[in-house]
Regions:
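Active-site acidic short loop of glycosyltransferases
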Residues: 13-19, 40-41, 147-148, 175
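Flexible "cap/lid" loop of the alpha/beta hydrolase fold
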Residues: 37, 46-79
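Conserved loop-alpha-helix segment in the C-terminal half of the alpha/beta-hydrolase fold
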Residues: 150-184
């Protein structure tokens, strides 16, 4: 994650962006957090949506097939069974990711869900997951080093990341704020776009003053 944070920091410099607010969802939230810890002078704040903020001891079932450390095995599966497995498990995977909310209408096409069926997507997603699991311990325990305005939005019924661990514990350790949406799940950017928009805009207003 530190490597990806470094890429974003270089992009900010190259484009001469003046301290942007960084928004991150799920694993993107972990990358945003790494950016804030390593390059706090380049950003104005964080708006985190259902972020992965703590070490994951148990990989969620829908990602277990992606947790492959061997590059050779990853390449083999990507070009043989991954698409078939993805098709067979697509319905259950989507339902778990969105639970307890309904899957967004036509998520496979309009939401890009079926893009995950490609060999290239399988390889990159697997790499990201493995790298995230290995680098997460380097961030955990540094919550008190967070020096930029930060607020977290979480779904109370998130089945991918535990709100108490990744949301409430993180907020307590870092001294930052959290808003929990009752009865909502992990895919808030798609199921609760108005809530997310209001959340992000409020942080933009706060960090631009």
């Amino acid at each position: 994650m530190q490597g990806q944070a470094g890429i974003i920091a270089k992009f900010i410099d190259k484009e001469q962006i003046d301290k942007p607010l960084i928004v991150g969802h799920s694993l993107g939230g972990a990358i945003a957090l790494a950016l804030a810890l390593e390059y706090e002078n380049k950003i104005s704040g964080l708006a985190l949506i259902c972020p992965a903020t703590q070490t994951v001891d148990k990989v969620p079932d829908i990602f277990r097939f992606l947790n492959i450390s061997s590059r050779l095995l990853r390449f083999f599966l990507a070009h043989t069974f991954s698409s078939l497995f993805g098709i067979l498990t697509r319905k259950d995977t989507f339902e778990i990711a969105f639970s307890p909310e309904p899957v967004s209408e036509n998520f496979s096409i309009k939401g890009g869900g079926d893009l995950a069926l490609t060999s290239k997507a399988f390889i990159k997603t697997s790499e990201d997951l493995v790298f995230a699991l290995s680098s997460a311990p380097l961030l955990v325990g540094r919550e008190k080093e967070l020096n930029v305005p930060t607020k977290t939005l979480f779904g109370e019924k998130d089945e991918i990341l535990d709100v108490k661990l990744h949301g409430e514990k993180f907020a307590e350790l870092s001294g930052t704020r959290i808003k929990v949406l009752a009865g909502k799940g992990h895919m808030l950017p798609l199921t609760q776009p108005e809530e997310c928009s209001t959340f992000i805009r409020s942080m933009m207003d706060e960090t631009s003053t």
